[in-house]
Amino acid sequence: MISNFILFALFIVTIALITKPLGSYIFRVFNNERTYLDWLAKPFQRVYLLVLGESSKKEQTAKAYFFSLVSFSVMAFIFVLVILLLQGILPLNPQEIKGMSFPQALNTAVSFITNTNWQSYSGETDVSYFAQMLALAVQNFVSAAVGLCVAIALIRSVARHETATIGNFWNDLGKGIFWILLPISIVIAIVYIFQGVPQNVMAYLHVHTLAGTEQIIPQGPIASQEAIKSLGTNGGGFFNANSAHPYENPTVITNYIQMVSIFAIAAALTYTFGKWVGNTKQGWLIFGVMLVLFIISLVVMTISELHGLDFLHSKDIQDIYGQVGHLSNMEGKESRFGVFYSTLYNTVSTSASDGGVNSVLDSYSPLAGMMAMLNMAIGEVIFGGVGAGFYGFFMFLMLAVFIGSLMIGRAPSFLGKRIEANDMKWTMFALLISPCCVLVFTGLAAVIPSVHQALTNSGAHGFSEILYAYISGANNNGSAFAGLSANTNYLNITIALSMLIGRFGVIFAVIMLAGSLVKKKRSLQMSEISSLDTTSFIFAILVFFTILLIGGLTIFPALGLGPILDQLNLNFL
């Protein structure tokens, strides 16, 4: 138990220590200031901008920024879709893997361009090396960079005033890749290789075991994809077992690096925001609220798993476990990680829009599974995905400012900018589109016979598997309750739709809000006379409960039919 506390403390301290330097670095990159990696990144950026031509030089309005973002995503979607359909005739395919069916290729392409990485396939049997490297791994970089671009555009809109432009998407995209994601990923990949993660394009090995049977050992360019999988909060594993596989996550060191990587950029953006708007206290307040939400989620999930079998009263089981006083739930977990390493990793991955797992979420106790759902359902705002976590949290921040200001009889304002009705329309659109998407698609799936046939469990847990799939898709997480066999035409198409709506619907609202904020006057006098201090402890509490009430209550009735009912059924066994 003491070792668990030490690990947790070390993890939190590590995240806190890297937040300021990495946040400052991101600030310098996007403000065109000198950085230590200019010598490495600038040559790539020059070639990239030369190819783009004039489109990368002019500042863009919010509408132009969004149009460029969508245009790029459409091109990326077509690129990935074609490769997945034709991978059977493309090179670097020693296992002679055939092309995917159209519904599955559609789902996978949408999944990777939206930074969701939902996988209705098994990576080692359904995707060639060529497709892994040129389609999926590339999208791990660019989809994360797209989310980062949106966050940076939003931050600019708060810092700037009385102008119409929020930056240039193409320029921001290159900076995100060449200065941030690519250099850090290279370092992480090298560490992974030294830790035993394979990096090759060899054919799978056929070995004879001592029992006289043949075993196939997969190979592949795993280290390079694993690095960006975590750093870019993508989560899509090279193998079906994801980070529970010893090739993806062989040691406690790689496990720790993956967890830190998942939170690194999201945490750093809180400081980037504070530095950019000239109020670092504001950034640390966001960091603090995120951290408290994370700790609460981790504690509930861990306690639920440590005492996950206490409802069993069999004398034989009590005789075996009587010495420890409680029954921990080790089903679906790697014995080399144990309960706490598993719950810590999965709390991190479901809090961020990562979706990687080092244990089987479907085998968790109902309450622990519910916490994973809540982490996603509130909008992935507990640090969240690269960029997406920050702009999702900012929507709740705006709502808290609006509610708090009205409660004290003041005109709503944030950092000297007046918050008006149009701003709140975009804010609420961003906050409600994903929950609406989840509830509609879950309700439809619950009455579709083909979905029932895809379930391995019935009743409350079966409903939880359906609910989890659409929460994960709409909030761009990508993890799953594996009891749902997701490779059906209906699920491939509807989950793809939920991913598209959850990603680009929210991004559209965020960029439109940015376009509104950037045009406003910034009055320091307005900020000073307002009695709503947005860096105070009271305001932090207001933001905390706004997230819980607005984010949590929208999905609570569905949770009541799923994991809560599932837990009650266990308690009354």
Swiss-Prot record:
Q: Name one GO cellular component term.
A: plasma membrane
Origin species, per record, is Francisella tularensis subsp. novicida (strain U112)
Domain of life here? Bacteria
InterPro entries xref list: KdpA
Task: Look up and give the membrane topology term.
Answer: Multi-pass membrane protein
- Predominant subcellular localization, coarse grouping: membrane
Role summary = Part of the high-affinity ATP-driven potassium transport (or Kdp) system, which catalyzes the hydrolysis of ATP coupled with the electrogenic transport of potassium into the cytoplasm. This subunit binds the periplasmic potassium ions and delivers the ions to the membrane domain of KdpB through an intramembrane tunnel.
Where does the record place it? Cell inner membrane
Q: How would you summarize the oligomeric state and partners of this protein?
A: The system is composed of three essential subunits: KdpA, KdpB and KdpC.
What's in the keyword line of the UniProt record?
Cell inner membrane, Cell membrane, Ion transport, Membrane, Potassium, Potassium transport, Transmembrane, Transmembrane helix, Transport
NCBIfam families for the chain: kdpA (TIGR00680)
Spell out the protein name for this chain.
Potassium-transporting ATPase potassium-binding subunit
A single GO molecular-function term is: potassium ion binding
Question: What family is it from?
Answer: Belongs to the KdpA family.
Q: Where do the TM regions start and end?
A: 6-26, 66-86, 135-155, 177-197, 257-277, 283-303, 382-402, 428-448, 493-513, 537-557
